[in-house]
Amino acid sequence: MIEKPNFFVFTGGPGVGKTTLIRHLQAEGEFVVEESARAVIREQATSGGTGVPWLDAKAFCDLTARRDIAIFDAMAGETRRVFFDRGIADSYRANDVEPSAELVEAIRTRRYNRRVFVFPPWREIYETDNERRQDWAEAERTFDKILSVLPEI
């Protein structure tokens, strides 16, 4: 079991200000980890892969989870406060995908601080883009799904 009380997770639906706050904290000198999902989507687009949520949600979740696990493990010795734009469990809940045994074990054995920062839907700032294709109704449903994962973080 790896318990990291200095690892803080920002979670919630898409387009609600998590990344904006993460970037602000980084500018203030805090140590931050950007969201893996957007990096996976960009990599898949560049390589012509199908591991994106609108083509193959399972592959997307597996790629995102593996990246999140690798980042967590690589930073296990970090003693500074670290803010994560989403946690290991976020992608599979947000996409209604059954987690692999590897992911279930990773969630069970890698623990962030119990204080999780949850960002609720915020319609006034919500925007779609090439990587965030959910309409507002889907963004709200995603938030509800993310809430179900909180006990696992």
Predicted regions and their residues:
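Glycine-rich phosphate-binding loop used to anchor ATP phosphates in small-molecule kinases
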Residues: 61-111
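Hydrophobic anchor at the beta1->P-loop junction of P-loop NTPases
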Residues: 10
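Conserved lysine of the Walker
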Residues: 18
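Walker A (P-loop) phosphate-binding loop of P-loop NTPases
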Residues: 15
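A glycine- and Lys/Arg-enriched "phosphate-lid" helix/loop adjacent to the NTP-binding pocket
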Residues: 99-153
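Conserved substrate/cofactor phosphate-moiety recognition/catalytic segment
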Residues: 23-67
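Phosphate-binding P-loop
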Residues: 1-5
